[in-house]
Amino acid sequence: MPIHVLEEANRCLQCKNPQCRKGCPISTNIPEMIRLFKENELETAAAMLFANNPLSVVCSLVCNHGKQCEGHCVRGIKGSPVHISSIENYISDSCFERIKVKMAEPNGMKAAVIGAGPAGITIAILLASKGYKITIFESRDKIGGIMRYGIPEFRLPHSILDRYYTKMREMGILFRPNFTIGGNITLEDLFRDGYRSIFIGTGAWRPRRMLIPGETFGNVHYAINYLNNPESVDLGQSVAIFGSGNSAMDVARTAIRQGVKNVTVYERRDKVTASPDEFEFAKLDGVQFEFHETATAIKDDGVMLSETEVQEDGKVVTKPGTEHFVPCDSVVIAVSQVPKHRLVEHNSGLKLNERGTLATDAEGETTMPGVFASGDVVTGAKTVVDAVHVSKMIAEEMDQYMQAHKDDVNA
């Protein structure tokens, strides 16, 4: 056991009104986790964490802990907060294979999960534990979604997702890789074959454009495409990155590891939108930052930039007469992603909302009865823990829906 993990656990004050738990989007019982850890009840602690958050191992690595649990720790008022993420990671990771998921008796009903990202995995695990026969349909060859194809391995090792695949197969969950619903196989086909309910968790994979000249040039890449397979992209010796969220930090830090000598992130405002930890890690890796700058055009050998200012109403505008050229070998656009809508195009019962994401009601049901959705396909690009938080509620709603329709023919 790493010494610092035990030292951090001993720093916990076991607050009667734990602010750390209030800071967690899924209300992880952090004091109880630490108490069990100190009493050497690791497997009990791991089972508790998994029951509350099936993606506990992942979240312990990629959550914005400085804003959530650790950011609310009272120890942080006059010093450093308890390093809760290290404790959670040690427990969840070391005991993962030994966690015994409580499984209800099979109830004879099937549910389909479309998409094996954070939302889909959460739904599949929770419904399988309730006795449903689950099949996951995934367009790629492995599970993980954005966790595998959008988060660098130095932040989230792919081996963790492979272990999740093994765990899910042990739970009886079936997996159809390299298979896209919409087109040859429709949602109606799934209902015809006896699936009582369908979950859509297809994520947000379409890059948001900057809508400036030069965006189609060969030296321009989108963050989601680059992070999918960095080894296939030659960025040259210098890269300009536009956008300052966690994806931009992932691109910048990956580029450094790929040998790019000059990596610069440009942000229109005076601070990044990434988590403070990711920002600091990027600076430590050697990433440069330029604020109050925006791209107006991309050239074959660089970018045209203009200085910006933030008005009183919060709107960012360019300063006239400040346009200047900055040379670089390549450009990466990291200004978020939006969902693709193949399913909507092939299923008239599904509708979009005013934001261009899949429309659902307060219970997560889409405009097509029996079809539910959550995660980035509904909210736009969010975090793993956000997907888990909403998907836990959706799993309960799907369970209630299927129980209410269990006697329907081909429901």
What is the role of each PLM region?
Residues 136, 140-171, 175, 252-296, ...:
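Rossmann-like dinucleotide-binding cores of NAD(P)H-dependent redox enzymes
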Residues 54, 117-118, 142, 245-247, ...:
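Residue-level detector of alpha-helix initiation sites
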Residues 1-110, 200-217, 287, 299-301, ...:
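Ferredoxin-type iron-sulfur electron-transfer modules and their immediate structural context
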Residues 216-236, 313-381:
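FAD-site-proximal beta/loop scaffold in flavoenzymes
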Residues 109-135, 248-256:
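N-terminal Rossmann-like FAD-binding beta1-loop-alpha1 element of flavoenzymes
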Residues 177-193, 292-302, 308-309:
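A conserved short coil-to-beta-strand element within the FAD-binding core of flavoproteins
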Residues 88-104, 163-183, 206-258, 352-367:
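Glycine-rich dinucleotide-binding loop and its adjacent helix/turn
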